[in-house]
A protein has these predicted regions:
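Eukaryote-biased recognition of intrinsically disordered, low-complexity regulatory segments
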Residues: 1-9
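A short N-terminal beta-strand-loop micro-motif at the entrance of redox/enzyme domains
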Residues: 9-15
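Charged, low-complexity surface patches
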Residues: 12, 134, 144, 187, ...
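Fe-S ferredoxin-like electron-transfer domains
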Residues: 46-190, 196, 203-222
């Protein structure tokens, strides 16, 4: 243990602990902008500087470890002056039109500036302006970039895609698509991790709420919405709702108040996907098609984009099943339209999805022209849903639990677990078990595949009616790349893989 003093608090912490971690252990928060634990600990923003007694210069707390006998000041006059000056300099290169920014109220830079009582920027504004095709599902605004490098590190270390890179030096430093490529040709999987970890509004998904409003304004248009299983676990946070309050039934109420005509649960089409994937797996397994290479799930459009760009020779190993989103879109404009005696051309199919890649999936030619245009007409992410509710002046606390519309309400429960890693695999295996044996498996028969282990993927072996089935579940594109390489080198062998 190392004995130190932080802001007059004497504590002992393990060797190797950073100053920031030591301060956090006694509930002393240190402002930070670029820090991302274990991923981006480069001290680039210098907002987290602290003063160490006996040293003339300030040090970054995120990447400097404690030493025996250190006396540290996290908010001394010298630290406050330096920190405020640093943030003022950052703001001089930042388009601070917060009122029109999607991250207003949820922006790290905005929070830090407010906490430091910065009410004016004394330096001349020098804002970087770069062109970007805002029709693309992923939108980058260079004028809001603070060069924190989070997007680069997340894309490199977690996803292994290397889409973003830094160029220039000093004040001319900028972040952009690596190798000066256009984002549309850069093999981006549209996983959205760079958006999630961006501390400002420099990265965001394309906002499609206006498309929905235009449909709602058309009296001849029937707006039909579906809500993905994963959304119910993530929505409402920015609206101040607790996990217990943010039920999926309240989303139904919100959408109806906004003017949506019918609201369905994508769990229904997740069941359709599972039946197709389970049936396809049994058929391919029985035919010996999986003896060398596995069948891969096809629900995640980010993963589908990844395999098409990185491992095109393995595309034929994907399940032929559409994603639940696209299956529901097809159902809406065929079975639902027929049942309700509605012209499919009048149906506007809306999807509430957790992922920006779903916007790209909707636009694929594969899902166009089968009936009334695209199967899905508009995709809103969870963040857009929250903004939509605020824009309609709906008080989240007044939302009530409302039931989904019929007839596509009933589900087996298999679709609900799609929102968890391993959920698709577990549901597919349960279906395969029933298709092979004619019996339902035990409730926890496949529970060991839930989650991902420290090696990046979970593997398991099951016996079904005398057949040995090897499966794997992986999350994260870098982990997926490692798994794909191992499969191609014959280091591992699986019959079925969920990504």
């Amino acid at each position: 243990m190392v004995n130190i003093t932080i802001d007059n608090h004497t504590i002992a912490v393990p060797s190797g602990t950073t100053i920031m971690e030591a301060a956090a252990s006694i509930h002393i928060p240190i402002p930070k902008l670029c820090y991302l634990k274990d991923i981006n600990e480069i001290g680039a923003c210098r907002v987290c500087v602290v003063e160490i007694e006996g040293q003339d210069h300030l040090v970054t707390s995120c990447n400097n470890v404690v030493e025996e006998g250190m006396t540290i000041y996290t908010n001394s006059p010298k630290v406050r002056r330096n920190r405020k000056h640093t943030v003022e300099m950052i703001l001089s290169q930042h388009d601070a039109q917060c009122a029109t920014c999607v991250r207003s109220g949820n922006c790290t830079l905005q929070t830090v500036a407010n906490d430091l009582n910065i009410v004016d920027s004394p330096y001349k504004k020098e804002i970087c302006i770069e062109e970007w095709d805002t029709r693309y599902p992923l939108v980058r605004d260079a004028s809001k970039c603070v060069k924190c490098m989070r997007c680069i590190q997340v894309c490199d270390k977690i996803q292994g895609m290397h889409i973003w890179d830094v160029s220039g030096t000093g004040a001319r430093t900028t972040v952009g698509v690596s190798e000066n490529r256009d984002i549309k040709t850069a093999d981006c999987a549209l996983c959205g991790q760079c958006i999630t970890h961006c501390p400002t509004g420099a990265l965001r998904e394309r906002d499609d709420t206006d498309k929905l409003y235009r449909a709602l304004e058309d009296k001849d248009t029937i707006v039909v919405a579906q809500i993905a299983p994963a959304v119910r676990a993530a929505w409402g946070e920015s609206l101040g709702l607790s996990r217990e309050e943010a039920t999926v039934e309240k989303i139904v109420d919100a959408l109806r108040r906004i003017g949506v005509d019918y609201v369905f649960d994508t769990t229904f089409s997740a069941d359709l996907t599972i039946m197709e994937e389970g049936t396809e797996f049994v058929e391919r397994f029985t035919n010996g098609d999986l003896d060398m290479y596995p069948m891969f799930t096809s629900c995640c459009p980010g993963w589908v984009r990844f395999i098409k760009s990185q491992y095109p020779q393995m595309v034929n190993r994907l399940s032929s099943a559409k994603s639940p989103q696209e299956m529901f879109g097809a159902v809406m404009k065929t079975a639902f339209a027929k049942k309700m005696n509605i012209d499919p051309d009048r149906i506007f199919a809306l999807s509430i999805m957790p992922c920006v890649a779903k916007k790209d999936e909707r636009e694929k030619p594969l899902f166009h022209g089968e009936f009334a245009g695209h199967g899905v007409d508009c995709v809103l992410t969870t963040r857009e849903l929250d903004r939509l509710i605020r824009a309609d002046h709906i008080d989240p606390k007044t939302l009530k639990d409302a039931a989904f519309d019929t007839p596509f309400t009933e589900g087996t429960g298999a679709g609900v677990i799609f929102g968890a890693t391993g959920g698709v695999m577990e549901a597919a295996l349960r279906s395969a078990y029933y298709l092979i044996t004619g019996k339902n498996p035990e409730v926890d028969a496949f529970k060991q595949i839930r989650g991902v282990n420290k090696n990046g993927w979970t593997e398991a072996q099951f016996e079904i009616a005398g057949n040995t089935i090897n499966i794997a579940v992986v999350s994260g594109l870098q982990n997926t790349r490692n798994l794909m390489e191992a499969i191609q080198k014959r280091e591992v062998h699986y019959h079925f893989v969920e990504v």
